[in-house]
């Protein structure tokens, strides 16, 4: 969370330093998701072959190192290659750390995965504050990223001894012998649920500010209010989700989350005013907060796939939602209008509600 937010917050500075226009920047930034997608299968294989502790240790060194490389980029080619490598190392870190999270959750014998993702959001918030401070003191991105590398290195050295030494299955469960197996319907359902939720997340990340600016039309200083509302409830929701799962069960929480997502989006579409739209975005943040962490948690319990491979499979399917959702919004907004686009995303959010009961059958 700290590494990614540090990069995202310094994009304007790097854009100005390399004299990039919006079109070129958009093309260059596409290298990041390409790198993430290309590493999905590799991440699952490496975690299953060498264990999440080793992969996480190496990835936790390479990920911030790739960030430093971005700060040192002096051309479009270097920045593009750097973003591709940044995406690969980010995904290695993501799959390995979530595999560790599944193992720790198994030892606790209760839901704690959402809280782990809440810490990611909290670290991202801290990264944004640090970046604001760095910009205020005119610290160049390269120096800023070197400081972040030092911080992450210190965290790794401090916490490595607390990592699980090996990835194990619960007593009585057989460990699949093959690393690559065909995903069963249970894993595909989890991927579909993650797809719907991440399509909503991607929409909020990329289009919430535009929606407020063009549809709600608040004072200029309040244009980012919807995005801030979404991020706040997303972080808070992750810290409360585990308690809800303990009380009501993961499937019921996922099912309710889809309803909350759709309600929030439709509220902002049907009543496009500052108060109602902000309330709607608050609901969307709370609804999306727990879905992906719970999908990862359930995928880690697969009886047919190794945890690392199951997580990589669900993450791959879900990430397509994050990648495809925002462009679809743009096409529909161009053909009709932005309110119709958000109404469609509300229906996509409901896929989590429709698919969740099927998990119980599987």
Residue ranges and their predicted role:
Residues 83-119:
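Cytoplasmic helix-loop-helix junction between adjacent transmembrane helices
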Residues 9-23, 206-221:
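Short amphipathic helix-loop junctions that connect adjacent transmembrane helices
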Residues 38-77:
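Conserved MFS/SLC helix-loop-helix module at the cytosolic interface between two early adjacent transmembrane helices
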Residues 54-68, 252-267:
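Structural signature of the two symmetry-related core transmembrane helices
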Residues 19, 51, 72-77, 217, ...:
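Helix-breaking motifs and short loop linkers at transmembrane-helix boundaries and internal kinks
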Residues 39-52, 135, 237-250, 333:
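Helix-to-loop junctions at the C-terminal end of transmembrane segments
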């Amino acid at each position: 969370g700290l590494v990614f937010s540090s990069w995202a917050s310094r994009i304007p500075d790097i854009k100005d330093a390399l004299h990039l226009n919006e079109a070129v920047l958009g093309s260059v930034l596409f290298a990041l998701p390409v790198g993430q997608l290309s590493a999905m299968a590799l991440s699952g294989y490496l975690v299953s072959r060498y264990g999440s502790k080793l992969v996480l240790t190496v990835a936790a060194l390479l990920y911030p190192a790739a960030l430093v490389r971005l700060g040192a980029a002096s051309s479009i080619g270097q920045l593009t290659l750097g973003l591709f490598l940044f995406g690969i190392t980010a995904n290695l870190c993501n799959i390995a750390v979530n595999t560790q999270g599944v193992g720790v959750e198994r030892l606790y014998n209760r839901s704690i995965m959402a809280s782990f993702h809440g810490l990611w959001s909290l670290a991202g918030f801290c990264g944004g504050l640090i970046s604001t401070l760095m910009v205020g003191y005119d610290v160049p991105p390269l120096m800023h990223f070197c400081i972040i590398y030092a911080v992450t290195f210190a965290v790794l050295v401090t916490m490595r001894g607390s990592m699980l030494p090996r990835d194990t299955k619960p007593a009585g469960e057989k460990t699949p012998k093959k690393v690559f197996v065909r995903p069963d319907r249970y894993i595909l359902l989890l991927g579909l649920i993650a797809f719907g939720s991440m399509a909503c997340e991607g929409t909020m990340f990329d289009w919430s500010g535009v929606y407020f600016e063009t549809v709600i039309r608040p004072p200029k200083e309040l244009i980012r209010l919807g995005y801030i509302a979404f991020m706040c409830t997303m972080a808070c929701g992750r810290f409360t989700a585990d308690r809800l799962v303990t009380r009501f069960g993961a499937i019921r929480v996922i099912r309710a989350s889809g309803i909350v997502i759709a309600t929030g989006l439709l509220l902002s579409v049907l009543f496009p005013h500052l108060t109602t739209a902000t309330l709607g975005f608050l609901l969307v943040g709370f609804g999306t907060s727990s879905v992906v962490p719970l999908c990862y948690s359930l995928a880690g319990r697969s009886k047919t796939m190794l945890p690392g491979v199951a997580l990589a499979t669900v993450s791959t399917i879900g990430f397509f939602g994050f990648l495809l959702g925002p462009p679809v919004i743009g096409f529909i907004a161009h053909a009709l209008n932005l309110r119709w686009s958000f109404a469609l995303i509300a229906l996509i959010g409901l896929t989590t509600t429709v698919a969740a009961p099927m998990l119980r059958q599987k």
